[in-house]
Amino acid sequence: MTIRPLHDRVVVKRLEAEEKTASGIVLPGAAAEKPDMGEVIAVGAGKIGKDGARRPLDVKAGDKIIFGKYSGQTVKADGEELLVMREEDIFGIVEK
């Protein structure tokens, strides 16, 4: 199943969370925090402004992003947990 987001929404796959603390303590699955970084899988065509023009999104598929811990709606596709969120919920793009 493929999810094609509409308007200014993006589909994001969370990056794997660290399962060890900085001091080396291994965290059980429930204790590990959900990561607030992910990879953009798909983007919508953009939001339509008041003038009727479509504004393209600043993010694109493949971008690594930072978002709020409680951003987006969780969905399952092909056994994989993904997030669907608005572009405004994204704090920034991680550049190397």
Swiss-Prot record:
What keywords are annotated for this sequence in UniProt?
Chaperone, Cytoplasm
- Tell me one Pfam family matched here: Cpn10
Family classification: Belongs to the GroES chaperonin family.
Example GO CC term: the record gives: cytoplasm
User: Does this entry carry the keyword Thylakoid?
Assistant: no
> What organism does the UniProt record list as the source?
Neisseria gonorrhoeae (strain ATCC 700825 / FA 1090)
Cross-referenced CDD domains:
cpn10 (cd00320)
Show the PROSITE patterns listed in the entry: CHAPERONINS_CPN10 (PS00681)
State the InterPro entries in the record.
Answer: Chaperonin_GroES, Chaperonin_GroES_sf, Chaprnonin_Cpn10_CS, GroES-like_sf
Q: Where are the transmembrane segments?
A: none
Q: Which domain of life is it from?
A: Bacteria
What's this protein's name? Co-chaperonin GroES
Q: Where in the cell is it found?
A: Cytoplasm
Assembly mode: Heptamer of 7 subunits arranged in a ring. Interacts with the chaperonin GroEL.
What SMART domains does the entry give? Cpn10
* A GO molecular-function annotation: protein-folding chaperone binding
S-S bridge residues: none
One biological process term from GO is:
chaperone cofactor-dependent protein refolding
Q: What does this protein do?
A: Together with the chaperonin GroEL, plays an essential role in assisting protein folding. The GroEL-GroES system forms a nano-cage that allows encapsulation of the non-native substrate proteins and provides a physical environment optimized to promote and accelerate protein folding. GroES binds to the apical surface of the GroEL ring, thereby capping the opening of the GroEL channel.
